[in-house]
From Swiss-Prot:
NCBIfam families: rplX_bact (TIGR01079). One of its GO terms (molecular function) is rRNA binding. Part of the 50S ribosomal subunit. One of its GO terms (cellular component) is ribonucleoprotein complex. It comes from Marinomonas sp. (strain MWYL1). Transmembrane segments: none annotated. One of two assembly initiator proteins, it binds directly to the 5'-end of the 23S rRNA, where it nucleates assembly of the 50S subunit. It holds the Pfam family ribosomal_L24. The keyword Nuclease does not apply. Belongs to the universal ribosomal protein uL24 family. The lineage of its organism: Bacteria, Pseudomonadati, Pseudomonadota, Gammaproteobacteria, Oceanospirillales. This is Large ribosomal subunit protein uL24. One of its GO terms (biological process) is translation. Disulfide bonds: none annotated. Keywords: Ribonucleoprotein, Ribosomal protein, RNA-binding, rRNA-binding.
Length: 105
C-alpha cells in the first residue's frame, strides 16, 4: 500500500515550490507524483494539425519526487506523516501520525 495516492492533498516540503499545496493527479512509477499547480515547466511544442494543437510554448506540470511532498492534514492545517493501522475486520488503512485519524474515509 502506498503512502501517497491519487486525489490526496499534498504540500511541497522541499524545492522551488516549497509551501505550495495541490492534489495528486497521477502517481508516476515508484517514487514520483504529478501534483496540480506545482512544479510547472515550459515545453516547446510543434504545431500538429492532426491533434489540433497550434504549437508554441506550453506550460505544464512535471513530476516531483515523493520525498519532496508530504500529505496535508486539514484538521491540523499542517503537513503530516502517514502510518498504517489494521481495522477490526483486518483491512489495512492509512492514518495521520499526529492524530491517528484515518485518511481514507
Amino acid at each position: 500500500m502506498r503512502k501517497i495516492k491519487r486525489n490526496d492533498e499534498v504540500i511541497v516540503i522541499a524545492g522551488k515550490d516549497k509551501g505550495k499545496r495541490g492534489k495528486v493527479v497521477k502517481v508516476v512509477g515508484e517514487n514520483r507524483v504529478l501534483v496540480s499547480g506545482v512544479n510547472t515547466v515550459k515545453k516547446h511544442e510543434k504545431p500538429n494539425p492532426m491533434k489540433g494543437s497550434t504549437g508554441g510554448i506550453v506550460e505544464q506540470e512535471a513530476p516531483i519526487q515523493v520525498s519532496n511532498v508530504a500529505i496535508y492534514n486539514s484538521a491540523t492545517g499542517k503537513a503530516d506523516r502517514v502510518g498504517f493501522k489494521l481495522n477490526e475486520d483486518g483491512t489495512k488503512v492509512r492514518v495521520f501520525k499526529s492524530n491517528s485519524e484515518a485518511i481514507d474515509a
